[in-house]
């Protein structure tokens, strides 16, 4: 039975499986000195999708904070789909290998990633800004101003 059928596609359970798998390798006599995540974990697209993000609601905006260590702004794309879905995507590439150099340990995740967030109705999709500084992407979506309350309308009564 494969691991996906046991755990579904829950990233937390899948990551736990990889950690336990690495631990099993160390306790079964495998002398690979593998105390970190396996190469399969590093390359797993679902692991990339598990990129941590915080979402804050401020009085005038929504702020999305996503860890993007090692990425340049050109590697990151921020888009709005279907008028209310914020999409943050990108690709993290591994450095080109130099002749005679090999990885002894590989833990940083490589590959494509994508995070989607459903925006609330009061999000102004025409006023979105994004900045990546020190490996942290901050996307700010301004809120639409609250609708003005309807004023009472006076109807003139005519006498017949």
UniProtKB/Swiss-Prot annotation:
Gene3D superfamilies: 2.60.40.790. InterPro entries: A-crystallin/Hsp20_dom, HSP20-like_chaperone, Small_HSP. Keywords: Cytoplasm, Stress response. The keyword Aminoacyl-tRNA synthetase does not apply. Coiled coil: none annotated. GO terms for cellular component: cytoplasm. Pfam families: HSP20. The keyword Chloroplast does not apply. Residues 44-160 form the sHSP domain. Its main location: cytoplasm. PANTHER family: HEAT-SHOCK PROTEIN 20 FAMILY MEMBER. This is 17.9 kDa class II heat shock protein. The gene is HSP17.9.
């Amino acid at each position: 039975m494969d691991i996906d059928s046991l755990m579904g596609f829950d990233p937390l359970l899948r990551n736990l499986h990889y950690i336990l798998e690495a631990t099993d390798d160390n306790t079964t006599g495998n002398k690979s000195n593998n105390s970190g995540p396996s190469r399969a974990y590093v390359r797993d697209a679902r692991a990339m999708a598990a990129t941590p993000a915080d979402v804050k609601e401020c009085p005038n905006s929504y702020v999305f904070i996503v860890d993007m260590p090692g990425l340049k702004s050109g590697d990151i794309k921020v888009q709005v789909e279907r008028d209310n879905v914020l999409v943050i995507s990108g690709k993290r590439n591994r450095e080109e290998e130099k002749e005679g150099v090999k990885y002894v340990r590989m833990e940083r995740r490589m590959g494509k990633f994508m995070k989607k967030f459903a925006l609330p109705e009061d999000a102004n999709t025409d006023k979105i800004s994004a900045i990546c500084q020190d490996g942290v992407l901050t996307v700010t979506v301004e809120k639409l101003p609250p609708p003005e309350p309807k004023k009472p309308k006076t109807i003139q009564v005519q006498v017949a």
